[in-house]
Amino acid sequence: RVAAVLCLAFPLEAPRRSGPPRSRLDELDAVTVPTLVVQGERDRFGIPPPATNRRVTIVPGDHGLKKDVTAVAQTVANWLRDLAI
């Protein structure tokens, strides 16, 4: 049984060589358990919107999430504590 989903730098829209980017938002929208998405403020793959059961936290940096690893870790730790599963 899946209790929750953690997405670190979820690739919402992969850059393509031609044509419009294909969104993967439907994949996130299909998740029914609590979900945390941690995304860099300059992530070239896009930033998904928050939704029911989905928290989106923006941290400094890009898709690599390397600029502020402490912020990423603290965000995840706080979310896990709040879940209490």
Residue ranges, per PLM feature:
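Conserved strand-to-helix beginnings and helix N-cap segments that scaffold or border functional pockets
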Residues: 18-22, 48-49, 69-70
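Short beta-strand/loop motif that positions the catalytic acidic residue
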Residues: 30-32, 37-39, 58
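Conserved alpha/beta-hydrolase "acid-adjacent" motif
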Residues: 39-40, 44-50, 66
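Primarily recognizes the serine-hydrolase "nucleophile elbow" in alpha/beta-hydrolase
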Residues: 1-33
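Catalytic histidine-centered segment of alpha/beta-hydrolase-like enzymes
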Residues: 61-75
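Active-site regions of enzymes building and remodeling cell-envelope glycoconjugates
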Residues: 51-59
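C-terminal alpha-helix
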Residues: 75-83
